[in-house]
Amino acid sequence: MQKVSRRHKENFERTKNIVYSNIDEAIAVLKETATTKFVESVELHANLNIDPKYADQQLRTTVTLPNGIGKQVVIAVLTNEENFEEAKSSGGDIVGNDELIAQITQGQINFDLLIATPNMMPKLAKLGRMLGPKGLMPSPKSGTVTSTLQSTLTEFKKGKFEYKADKTGIVHVNFGKSNFTNEQLVENLKALYQSIEQNRPSGVKGKYFKSVSICTTMGPSVKLDLEIFA
């Protein structure tokens, strides 16, 4: 069993049983407890009053945070050959059609996001079982099936990404890195919370948010008072 360091224990004791009502203080504590030697991801965990087994209580949407999330996304584009140049000049890292489908079929998935033009979707249908579980299957709802490659690629290169609630109704999503400034993390956190709030499923009855906490990859949970966003 891996030994837990004294600093690690101290960090968890520091935030245990505390609910932070000041967003600046919460972010400061979050950064102070990110004590590993590598740059950690910063995560939000929002427990929502939804039951995703019902269609009108599902949450799946996209957001562009003001300061990005500190990750360079590799984007693959599946389109006709006449669109290759536009796709490449607009930020597509991997561009192709039938040969790209063949690579994916062989398990060569060297990208974080797949964008496709509508005419390519019938060819992609057979790969749904491979791409779906990885969250890589293009869909109109996520904006990854598009006829406007230039604007779509520009948005995703700027940091647009998709998030969704899991089957228990909890949203787990990164909103930055531990080396971001406090101000950048505050701005991103507020924007992400606002996005979740604005995309409240129509079937939600009563209170929407049950609880919200933030943490770094190896750090303790920092619980937030929901009034912090009022």
From Swiss-Prot:
Domain of life: Eukaryota
Signal peptide coordinates: none
Primary subcellular site in the record, as a coarse category: plastid
BP GO terms, sorted: translation
Compartments where located: Plastid, Chloroplast
Record note on quaternary structure: Part of the 50S ribosomal subunit.
HAMAP family in alphabetical order: Ribosomal_uL1_B
Family: Belongs to the universal ribosomal protein uL1 family.
Function recorded in the entry: Binds directly to 23S rRNA. Might be involved in E site tRNA release (Potential).
Protein name: Large ribosomal subunit protein uL1c
